[in-house]
Swiss-Prot record:
Keywords assigned by UniProt, alphabetized: Repeat
NAD found in the keyword field: no
InterPro entries: Pentatricopeptide_rpt, PPR_P_subfamily, TPR-like_helical_dom_sf
Pfam families the record matches: PPR (PF01535), PPR_1 (PF12854), PPR_2 (PF13041), PPR_3 (PF13812)
NCBIfam families named among the record's database cross-references: PPR
Gene3D superfamilies for the chain: Tetratricopeptide repeat domain
Keyword Repeat applies: yes
PPR repeat residue intervals: 97-131, 132-166, 167-201, 202-236, 237-271, 272-306, 307-341, 342-372, 376-410, 411-445, 446-480, 481-515, 516-550, 551-585, 586-620, 621-655, 656-690, 691-725, 726-760, 761-795, 796-830
Name of the protein in question: Pentatricopeptide repeat-containing protein At3g06920
């Protein structure tokens, strides 16, 4: 039927569309108001269907375009409008006029529902006319007012699809809206489309574009637009110059702002107060206060009373520089010129005092300002924020009461400040009380209120209370957001309740709340930290599945998590995936990748990355140097490690005990003990305290060098410095003492370790058993051997051989033989010496059958070794 209407319409086009030109044909319906009312009553009182159609058909009126237009102007439901629009086509078998189509588009604009736009524009295109200028503007304007800029952009693109020419004002409205939300690329696309359509850009349009690009710091693009404007024979006006000064200055391009300032007079224009004030603000922000003062004095000299905004800017400049005496003096000068300082001027001073934490001085200024201006909401909020941060809650509540008397409280902004600051100072009960006291009729909590309280409660472990507040949020008119879910997930995981954390994520999906990249990154980080590396990997894939581009933090979390889980070898592949994607590394990302390379043995790659980091302007941190120094030390490239150590010191980086310990361990392992001692001495001179790893590294080096007496002195120093030995420490000493055959002394340390409640390692057990057996203390060795096995320990070959020899030397022939058989059953090698000692004992005790077995084993072992040598 729609196709029929289109065909018929085309046949009658000349009579209705003025030769296809896009003109609106005015229609009036002065005498038809009642008919329109009757139609609207039918459409608005019941559902659409055969009954509604029959009722409309029964109305005694002759269908006319005027009725369609009148009805569409009244309807607020786009679906009902389309149903009526189609019913009219079927009833009359006549095409709609341009004004009817435009009226339908205006219904879509009012409802912000453009689902049928493609179809309607297609019909209009076939009919040979398009949306009117006013309709086009209204559709875009409706989207802008509803903050649906992407939909507004899509409306324009759909018009272009059907070869319609979007209105000039539709483009400029959208460009202005995108400028306000810093979407400069969208602005530029629309601007280029305007040029393609032959629209002549104005200075005002160029001003909007230049401001947008400059605000985002895209200076080259902004300057390019400025050059394009000049090449279009358009002269910059004072507004454009003011925008350039302000925008370029705010992104730190002070010299460029000066250049624009000097260009003004060169081009025959005169700087106004906005020009001067903008330039003063730029200079103050750049800490060029002397130049700002000079400019303000020039302004003051040439104008009897500079504008209040100029005074406020200069006062803020003085305050930011901590020059409060000058700021107060300027207030007096302002008064002397007959200009009473405004509340904004005082708020500027209070803001600066807040940044510096000068609470008492701020309260004095607050009392002083009452002589000139009534404090406003911002004034009270600045002070309450300061007082809560400083822990002066009683004064903050007194100020809140003053606000109430002034009619400024309750208001949700003040409540949010107080709840947030109370949470951050861990005054959770007070924050909860304030939340509960909120009068929903006067002051309703918003998303910020809920977010602050949920996060505050969660951080101190009150996750169940946080969840209850979240449930209240679900019951309220506030929409949950990714910030709330991020906080809940993180805090549940941080307090050991990972299953609840997973449940929160599922709740979020069920609530149709889309996660953002920050939430997904946080969730992935939580899973890795909770020991769930496979789930962490899966979340990284989900990030991509949700059409997010993983950023530097995503990769950093993944690489760091895999390193901790023992998959450091995957760092290389992930790093190059990151590079191929064009992901820009920050310092944290560099540090994590460098650490990963070091841990998987790719120290050369780590070293190269350290150099790349420097060339790209990122300063290596103590973490960077620590990873590479440790990596080099572990592969005995100690001279290179020491050079990096010296480089870090030359850059005044505060080196920590971990870096010193890496070098001590490295030098100790290769026997360069004197250098290890020198580094330990430097560590202590720096005021650092050696940690357990430091002492264990040094002890291990001394034991390996068989300097056992020095090791014992070192052990004593360690205890004197209040560093408690652990099982590794005792294991090193026991092994060292056994190595130099001081078995009884080793056993003393063994007993000391047991008294401390430490569980010896397998190496400590086997070393001690072997040592006691070799020392002839076979009773203790045997008891220790049995206890070790009873606790699930598995003795090694050295342990069995030592026990067999010890029992043999103690003339316990059959006990020794039993262990000999046990050793054979376990498939462990038995030394020739052990066999000889056992054989001798068995012969002495007339255990001839057992001696024959041992002799046979000894012969077989000898043959095997001879064959191996021959081979």
């Amino acid at each position: 039927m729609v196709g029929f209407a289109r065909t018929k319409f085309c046949k009658n086009l000349s009579s209705l569309s003025d030769n296809g030109e896009n003109h609106e044909k005015p229609y009036t319906f002065e005498g038809n108001r009642q008919t329109v009312n009757d139609i609207c009553n039918v459409l608005e009182t019941g559902p659409w269907g055969p009954s509604a159609e029959n009722t409309l058909s029964a109305l005694s009126f002759k269908p006319q375009p005027e009725f369609v237009i009148g009805v569409l102007r009244r309807l607020k439901d786009v679906n009902r409008a389309i149903e009526y629009f189609r019913w009219y086509e079927r009833r009359t078998e006549l095409p709609h006029c341009p004004e009817s189509y435009n009226s339908l588009l205006l219904v879509m604009a009012r409802c912000r529902n453009f689902d049928a736009l493609d179809q309607i524009l297609g019909e209009m295109s076939v009919a040979g006319f398009g949306p009117s200028v006013n309709t086009c503007i209204e559709m875009v304007l409706g989207c802008v007012k509803a903050n649906k800029l992407r939909e507004g952009y899509d409306v324009v693109q759909m018009m272009r699809k059907f070869k319609f020419r979007p209105a000039f004002s539709a483009y400029t409205t959208l460009i202005g809206a995108f400028s306000a939300v810093n979407h400069s690329d969208m602005m530029l696309t629309l601007f280029q489309q305007m040029q393609e359509l032959g629209y002549e850009p104005t200075v005002h349009l160029f001003t909007t574009l230049i401001r947008g690009f400059a605000k985002e710091g895209r200076v080259d693009s902004a300057l390019s637009l400025l050059d394009e404007m000049k090449s279009s024979s358009l002269d910059a006006d004072i507004v454009l110059y003011n925008v350039c000064i302000d925008s370029f200055g705010k992104v730190g391009k002070v010299d460029m702002a000066w250049k624009f300032f000097h260009e003004i007079e060169a081009n025959g224009l005169k700087p106004d107060e906005v020009t001067y004030t903008s330039m003063i603000g730029v200079l103050c922000k750049a800490n060029r206060l002397d130049e700002a003062v000079e400019m303000f004095e020039h302004l003051e000299k040439n104008r009897r009373v500079p504008c209040t905004y100029a005074y406020n800017t200069m006062i803020m400049g003085y305050g930011s520089a901590g020059k409060f005496d000058e700021a107060y003096s300027l207030l007096e000068r302002q008064r002397a010129k007959g200009s009473i300082p405004s509340v904004i001027a005082y708020n500027c001073i209070l803001t600066c005092l807040r940044k510096m934490g000068k609470v008492d001085e701020a309260l004095k200024v607050f009392e002083e300002m009452k002589k000139d201006a009534a404090p406003n909401l911002s004034t009270y909020n600045i002070l309450i924020d300061m007082l809560c941060r400083a822990g002066k809650l009683d004064t903050a509540f007194e100020l809140r009461d003053s606000m109430q008397k002034a009619g400024l409280f309750p208001n949700v902004r003040t409540v949010n400040i107080m709840v947030d600051r109370l949470c951050k100072s861990q005054k959770l009960d007070e924050a909860c009380a304030m939340f509960e006291e909120m009068d929903y009729k006067v002051c309703t909590p918003d998303e910020i209120t809920f977010c602050s309280l949920i996060d505050g409660l969660g951080k101190v472990g009150r996750v169940d209370d946080a969840y209850k507040v979240y449930e209240k949020m679900l019951d309220s008119d506030c929409r949950t957001n990714s910030i709330v879910y991020t906080s809940l997930i993180k805090n549940f995981f941080n307090h050991g309740r990972k299953e609840d954390g997973h449940k929160i994520y599922k709740d979020m999906i069920n609530q149709n709340c889309s996660p953002d990249l920050q939430l997904l990154n946080t969730y992935m980080d939580c899973m890795f930290k909770a020991g769930e590396p496979e789930k962490g990997r899966a979340m990284f894939e989900e990030i991509k599945a949700r059409r997010f581009v993983p950023d530097a933090r995503s990769y950093s979390i993944l690489i760091h998590g895999l390193i901790k889980a023992g998959f450091a070898n995957e760092t290389y592949e992930l790093f190059y995936s990151m590079k191929e994607q064009g992901c820009v590394l920050d310092t944290r990302a560099y540090n994590i990748v460098i650490d990963g390379f070091c841990k998987c043995g790719k120290v050369n790659k780590a070293y190269q990355l350290l150099e790349e980091m420097k060339t790209k302007g990122f300063e290596p941190t103590v973490v960077t140097y620590g990873s590479v120094i440790d990596g080099l030390a572990k592969i005995d490239r100690l001279d290179e490690a020491y050079m990096l150590f010296e480089e870090a010191k030359s850059k005044r980086i505060e080196l920590n005990v971990v870096i010193y310990s890496s070098l001590i361990d490295g030098f100790g392992k290769v026997g360069r003990i004197d250098e290890a001692y020198l580094i330990l001495e430097e560590l202590m001179q720096k005021g650092l305290t050696p940690n357990l790893y430091t002492w264990n590294s040094l002890l291990d080096a001394l034991v390996k060098a068989e300097e056992i007496n020095e090791a014992l002195v070192c052990f004593q120093s360690m205890k004197e410095l209040k560093c408690t030995p652990n099982q590794v420490t005792y294991g090193i000493l026991i092994n060292g003492l056994c190595k130099v055959r001081k078995f009884n002394k080793a056993f003393v340390f063994w007993q000391e370790m047991q008294k401390q409640g430490m569980k010896p390692s397998t190496i400590s057990y086997t070393t001690m058993i072997s040592g006691l057996a070799k020392a002839g203390n076979i009773a203790e060795a045997g008891a220790l051997f049995d206890r070790f096995k009873a606790n699930g320990g598995v003795p090694d070959s050295a342990c069995y051989n030592a026990m067999i020899e010890g029992l043999s030397n103690g003339n316990r022939a059959m006990d020794a033989f039993s262990l000999f058989e046990e050793t054979r059953r376990r498939g462990l090698p038995i030394h020739n010496k052990t066999c000889v000692v056992l054989l001798d004992t068995l012969h002495k005790n007339d255990c001839l059958e057992q001696a024959a077995i041992v002799g046979a084993v000894l012969r077989e072992t000898g043959k095997a070794r001879h064959a191996a040598r021959s081979w």
